[in-house]
């Protein structure tokens, strides 16, 4: 995605193909833009070819191809609302009804299944924010036209956008605007835009995106140069990415797709995102200089919280679908499928699956009124997802390990072992499963489960789910604040008061209940 394609120029483009979603090949080509990505001390020449990123990039490309596949049109396409006559992924179209919300859910789930739930920052994730910018554009004044333009670009073109909102864990005891040597801040204003420097961390999958949204979350700011929210193209001069160790590359070096079927293609690299005197064009700026507004872009009427948690709940439900299916297979392979304790643990995993699908459906079927006749996923169900999502994967991991034990480890090291004549008879005999399952059946199933619960990839994914909606403590404390802000707390207090008003020291205050004066021993003893 060229730095020349900004939302303002893109909105006025007349060429039909400039305002439609990319194909998979076009997405891959858009990554060959000279971006500055560093891994293991070397600059990556082409992320689409490098073994640390190439299959994960192709996993994203498959999403774009699915969008263009006529077989998926009923689920993955809906007309745009921008007037360009095109189509878009349903989640980029602000919903007006329950039917719209259910269409969003189906589309999110379809893409999530293509990732088995293990890529959380797919292109539709950022529809959670940009999908509402047209409706909530006035919040971004004096940059409201930029917000509208970004909404149109995202809906019509569906570029892949990461976000970087977390400050490096440096000098956490100081206000953010007192850490100017590290945190994102504006150094200068020019006719061309803002000159920005600083860093953000855990910019998930940013090496493979077209743009990065940069925002601020945290305590209120005092210095206006830190109050900045914007979107920047990944090929912009001054944008630098330092990638963490690649699980995809490790899988390629030490195994095969049979051995690492998830990490080898679904590794969202959580990178360090650095701006080194980068120029942010004015048309890409959403907030600047307003110390109060800079921390509110995700709140108020933005709809972002409801929408991204709806996306997250649906994706997590898909992930647990896979885990539950693998567990049903694994315990049968182990021959323990009729053991009561094992059944209880597998049943609990299915219960988590049912919980998150129920929360996702509740968000869709009970939407809250929004702006201009639009609706949002139900807020109370969204908040419930926020709390329970941080608990689910640690508990599911424990349930899998408790049920399968050493079966998760009792595996040969590489797919090549099965192609080695001296080993194959031994593997077929000693690694076979129960109930007619072959050694290959057993090893294939348990290797995927090991990737989910025991590998480095697994550890990252568990931490991802625990941190997905922010601090676990914040999720719980803010639930009280949200209840107070929405009137729920008053309603709950009122209900408790009404329940207690049904009786007092003299007994029942409800006339059709009988006081126990005729049978109460204490009352008789005092007479």
PLM feature spans:
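FAD-binding core of flavoproteins
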Residues: 163-312, 484-526
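Extended amphipathic alpha-helical segments enriched in small hydrophobics
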Residues: 311-369
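Short, charged, amphipathic alpha-helical segments
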Residues: 343-347, 375-383
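Alpha-helix capping/hinge segments and adjacent helical runs
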Residues: 380-524
């Amino acid at each position: 995605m060229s730095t020349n394609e900004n939302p303002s120029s893109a909105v006025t483009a007349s060429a039909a193909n400039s305002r439609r979603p990319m194909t998979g090949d076009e997405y891959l080509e858009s990554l060959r833009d000279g971006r500055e990505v560093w891994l293991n001390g070397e600059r990556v020449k082409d992320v689409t070819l490098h073994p640390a990123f190439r299959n994960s990039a192709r996993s994203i490309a498959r999403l774009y191809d699915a969008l263009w596949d006529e077989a998926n049109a009923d689920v993955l396409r809906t007309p745009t609302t921008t007037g360009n006559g095109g189509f878009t992924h349903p989640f980029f179209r602000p919903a007006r009804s329950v039917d719209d919300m259910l269409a969003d859910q189906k589309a999110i789930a379809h893409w999530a299944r293509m990732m088995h739930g293990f890529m959380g920052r797919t292109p539709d994730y950022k529809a959670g924010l940009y999908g509402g910018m047209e409706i909530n554009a006035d919040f971004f004044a004096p940059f409201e036209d930029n917000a509208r333009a970004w909404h149109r670009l995202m809906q019509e073109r569906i570029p892949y956008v990461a976000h970087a909102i977390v400050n490096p864990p440096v000098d956490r005891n100081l206000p953010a605007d007192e850490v100017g040597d590290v945190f994102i801040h504006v150094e200068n204003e020019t006719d061309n835009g803002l000159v920005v420097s600083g860093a953000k961390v855990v910019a998930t999958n940013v090496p493979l995106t077209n743009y990065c949204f940069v925002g601020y979350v945290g305590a209120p700011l005092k210095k206006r140069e830190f109050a900045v929210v914007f979107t920047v193209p990944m090929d912009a001069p001054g944008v630098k990415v330092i990638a963490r160790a690649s699980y995809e590359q490790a899988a390629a070096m030490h195994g095969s797709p049979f051995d690492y079927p998830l990490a080898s293609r679904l590794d969202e690299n959580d990178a360090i995102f650095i701006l080194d005197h980068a120029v942010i064009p004015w048309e890409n700026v959403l907030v600047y200089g307003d110390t109060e507004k800079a921390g509110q872009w995700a709140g108020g009427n933005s709809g972002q919280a409801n929408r991204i948690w709806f996306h997250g709940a649906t994706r997590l439900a898909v992930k647990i679908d896979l885990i539950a299916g693998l567990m049903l297979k694994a315990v049968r392979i182990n021959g323990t499928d009729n053991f009561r304790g094992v059944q209880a643990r597998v049943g609990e995993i299915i219960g988590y699956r049912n919980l998150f699908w129920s929360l996702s459906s509740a968000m869709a079927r009970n939407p809250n009124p929004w702006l201009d006749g639009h609706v949002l996923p139900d807020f109370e169900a969204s908040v419930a997802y926020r709390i329970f999502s941080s608990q689910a994967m640690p508990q599911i991991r424990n349930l899998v390990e408790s049920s399968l034990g050493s079966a998760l480890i009792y595996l040969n090291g590489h797919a090549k072992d099965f192609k080695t004549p001296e080993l194959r008879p031994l593997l077929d005999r000693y690694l076979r499963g129960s109930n007619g399952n072959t050694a290959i059946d057993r090893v294939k199933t348990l290797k995927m489960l090991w990737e989910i619960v025991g590998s480095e990839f697994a550890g990252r994914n568990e931490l991802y789910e625990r941190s997905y909606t922010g601090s676990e403590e914040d999720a719980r404390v803010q639930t009280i604040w949200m209840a107070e802000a929405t009137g729920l707390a008053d309603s709950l207090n009122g209900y408790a008061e009404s329940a207690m008003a049904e009786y007092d020291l003299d007994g029942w205050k409800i006339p059709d209940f009988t006081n126990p004066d005729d049978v109460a021993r204490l009352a008789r003893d005092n007479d």
